[in-house]
Every structure is written in C-alpha cells, then in structure tokens.
Design a protein with these regions (language model features):
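Flexible "arm" and connector segments at domain edges
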Residues: 1-67, 71-111
Length: 111
C-alpha cells in the first residue's frame, strides 16, 4: 500500500499550493461541503459504471477508473479532516478475519 502513503503525502503538499493551480488546493479551499459533493458525485459515477460491467458491455476498466476517482476524493477528505489513511487501514485490519455480521454487531450499539 505504498501508493496510499505517497498519495497522502502529495495531497498534503498540494494543500499549500495556489487554488488556481491545484485541484486539491481548490477543493480544500472551497471547504468540506465541496469535498463531500465531489465524493457524492464520484459515488454515483461508481454505481453507474458498475451497472456497465454487466453484459453486454462488461466494462470493468470504467468502473475501476471511477473507483480510483472515488478513493482519491476520499483521500482528499481524510487530509482535509486531518485523518491519516493508516487510521482507516488499521480499522480494516482489525475487522479482517471476522465474519461481517459478527464484526458489525460489535460496533453497532443498541439504542
């Protein structure tokens, strides 16, 4: 997962750039709502692209590209919120190996 570390570092560096010259700086400058709007947009694009993976199109490359876009914007969000990607990876690592329903029950508190 070296790419995650490298991407995180690059995003942090670009936050300091001129928003007129850096897409990351522009998103950061426009604030949380703009970043969330982009994540929503990218999520929708993933859903639509995934529908294209079924016959007859079978376009897996498109959905893969859209997922990369979504991950990128999630990385921008993490940086904006001052959350390290490693924190997310640790949570995933802790969940690995447990059945999904068992793991979910552990983190779902009754109301």
């Amino acid at each position: 997962m070296q790419i995650i570390t490298e991407l995180s570092k690059t995003i942090k560096e670009r936050l300091k750039a001129d928003p007129k010259k850096s897409y990351v700086a522009l998103l950061h400058d426009k604030g949380l709502n703009k970043i969330l709007e982009k994540i929503s947009e990218e999520s929708t694009e993933v859903i639509l692209a995934a529908k294209d993976t079924v016959e007859p199109k079978n376009d897996k490359e498109h959905v893969t590209e859209e997922i990369a876009d979504l991950w990128f914007h999630c990385m921008v969000l993490l940086t904006h919120l001052d959350i390290e990607p490693e924190d997310v990876l640790k949570i995933l690592e802790n969940r690995f190996g447990e059945g999904g329903l068992v793991e979910k029950a552990k983190r779902t508190s009754p109301k």
